Amino acid sequence: MLSAQELLAHAESLTDSVQLVDRILRAGLLLHASDVHLDPAADSVRVRFRIDGALEEVLRIPAAMQNAVTSRLKVLASLDIAERRAPQDGGFSWRMGGAGAFAASPLDVRMATLPVRHGERVTLRLLETGGKRLGIAELGMSDSDRAAFEAVLRRPHGLVLLTGPTGSGKTTTLYAAIQELMKGEPLNIITVEDPIEYEIPGVAQAEVDSADKVNFAKALKSLLRHDPDVVMIGEIRDSDSLDAAVKAALTGHLVLSTLHTNDAKSSVTRLVDMGLDPNLVPATLRLAVAQRLVRRLCPECRTKGVRGWEPKGCVACGGRGYWGRIGLFEMYAPETGLSTSIADDARAKVDAGITSEAEILRALGG
């Protein structure tokens, strides 16, 4: 089987859009890219992969191939190939052919187009549906944070929130929590997601309607009639979804969800701003977990510098100096007063040579 580098070598000379798209998707899968960006310019289309959170240019396609490549992707995603002046969204499933370990690797691809000056910009989100889901032990939590997180999952009711910006790994942590819950006694677990990112065998997963016929609040009210033990809501977006989540948490259900705040303690302020009675916070919010993602230093080539461990680059990591990502976490529990610091977690990971000072500055700022 060809490597990602071999697939992309001389790909710009291909005149068959089917082959070119296939090579881009194959290379993206082999490099574990989370996103593919196709950015049109006057004379070419820049192809970039987001690998471990960082964008890398991997290919330049001649401008003459732009429409053919975009049309091929639109056909796969069942989009209107004639519509080039309005944004479109769609998706498709794709499997890598050939022999070897990746022969049957399924890939769910979400596609979005945006008309720009020199054509249509295309972004592909790659979801490896057959890939192994991370467990709590693999997220990167410290022993104390992990113990607090697992303890709250054993509680029969209450609200558990994952907070952080987009792309900070909140959904991955939610799925890890669901997997942990499924290890114990049989539970009726129902999720409401927008969209469903990964199928979880044994879990009833509902998807929010993009036309807003079924929003988070409506879906949550409905699923409570199905006798759930655990409810996972993709995101608490407004006062209606918050009200439904709080009622579920106060009536004997364990509710897991996400919120956009910068740190764990700010989740309380955000909930109150959205309409939660401050007196209900300790009785409702069991735990808020704030997180960020940073790149792991490649263990094969990391070097000890003046400011600690630093990236170098080798064959094993493709010259990047990093391989994979790990979470930075902090916890806050209003009921018990538990409060840990993401800055302390970051410092511990730098000192241990897991990540670099530069990555911490990128993720947390100065």
Map each language-model feature to its residues:
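Short, flexible helix-loop junctions that flank or precede catalytic/ligand sites
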Residues: 4-366
